Amino acid sequence: MKVILASKSPRRVEILEKIVKEFEVVQSNFDENTIDFKGDVEKYVKDLSRNKAIEVSKRLNEPSIVIAADTVVFQNGKVLEKPKSEEDAFSMLSSLSGNTHKVYSGICLINTYDDTVVTDCDCTEVKFSELNPRQIRNYINSGEPMDKAGAYGIQGLGGAFVERIEGCYYNVMGLPLNKLYKALENYDITIL
């Protein structure tokens, strides 16, 4: 059975390559703005990942396992997704500075052969060091934060701001590896 990653994220591709040797990337065209956050972060990221997987699975013509994910940063009751502008990134990074936040990733696997759907969610707590405005501006000028939830990438330059994490590192990158591995064990595909 084919494995399809419903994501254009190079980080998700890199993570999936650790456990699945052969898969295809098919970008989801699901409009994430059609789902509003209503207070339950786990439900929100699961719903987003499920809808991404459904959209891709409808375009496939052969039995496949479709994997989709969605990641958000959550702090003080607010969801921080990808910044819309450099000012938005500055505001996000300023709020993360010196504080702890949580990163939630929802995953969804759809077996197109029998239409079974599996969803799960992981949460990682991240503590940022204090950042001054110059450090934040320099980071924004690198371009790195503009396509990442919460305006930082732990695997890149943004990792320098992280004092500690509690939970799955790969979850912060966008795909909770351990949860995904456990979910994939239920299918007849070669992993590891």
UniProtKB/Swiss-Prot annotation:
The keyword Hydrolase applies. It holds the Pfam family Maf. Keywords: Cytoplasm, Hydrolase, Nucleotide metabolism. The record marks R11, T71, Q155 as: Important for substrate specificity. It catalyses: dTTP + H2O = dTMP + diphosphate + H(+); UTP + H2O = UMP + diphosphate + H(+). Its EC number is 3.6.1.9. GO terms for cellular component: cytoplasm. Its cofactor is a divalent metal cation. It is found in: Cytoplasm. GO terms for molecular function: dTTP diphosphatase activity; UTP diphosphatase activity. The active site is at D70. It is an enzyme of class 3 (hydrolase). PANTHER family: BIFUNCTIONAL DTTP/UTP PYROPHOSPHATASE/METHYLTRANSFERASE PROTEIN-RELATED (PTHR43213), BIFUNCTIONAL DTTP_UTP PYROPHOSPHATASE_METHYLTRANSFERASE PROTEIN-RELATED (PTHR43213:SF5). Belongs to the Maf family. YhdE subfamily. Nucleoside triphosphate pyrophosphatase that hydrolyzes dTTP and UTP. May have a dual role in cell division arrest and in preventing the incorporation of modified nucleotides into cellular nucleic acids. This is dTTP/UTP pyrophosphatase. It comes from Clostridium perfringens (strain SM101 / Type A). The lineage of its organism: Bacteria, Bacillati, Bacillota, Clostridia, Eubacteriales.
